[in-house]
Amino acid sequence: MVPISQKIYALDDIWQMDFEKYPLASHYNEYPFLVFENLVSKDECKRALNSLSSCDYKAKLVGSGLDESIRKTIIHTPTKEIKEVFEKAFFKVKEKVEKFYGVSFLKGTELQVLEYKEGGFYKCHADNASEIVKDGKLVGYKVVKPERKLTTLMFLNDDYEGGEVEFCHLRYANGDRVIHKPKAGEMIVFPSHGLFAHEVKPVYGNNRFAVVKWWDVI
């Protein structure tokens, strides 16, 4: 395994693949991604969630044209309240993120609200690239959304079972998988490229709501 931070390693075969791995934080950091806990208050999370349920909000179902064996998610166009909550949270940490990755933010994509209902999941994927598979084996990633360099993911609730984020190609020194259990009000920031391909574990008990925006950087 190859160390990409003080605590996290990349699998050898993935690291050796020839695909874009920009940006990447210094390996002197404890972790190669950032987690900002309690960035959004419980009241703000509640206000954001209520804005989805308090109006005749029509979700854009992700299912038409997509393979539900890979992804079972509902995407909502964000409400005004959700946009306000996200932007306030993001600008609290913007400079820290830029310093951590040695980048400057450019334009971001449109905000998305991701809802995972009972049994909802998302199998391993990279946010800006498609898998290159040969003879049934992953051999690399091809960038298909170059405007996505960094992923900012904010969680609005945690009153459900499952729904963990696992980074498929990363491990701890002892070989354990890198799995993050989301907490309401926190934001996690990580590169959008193939090295940080990740999956969302199946959700049970309650619906899981998260807000995501991808950023181009230089």
Residue spans for each PLM region:
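Fe(II)/2-oxoglutarate oxygenase catalytic core
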Residues: M1-F190, G194-I218
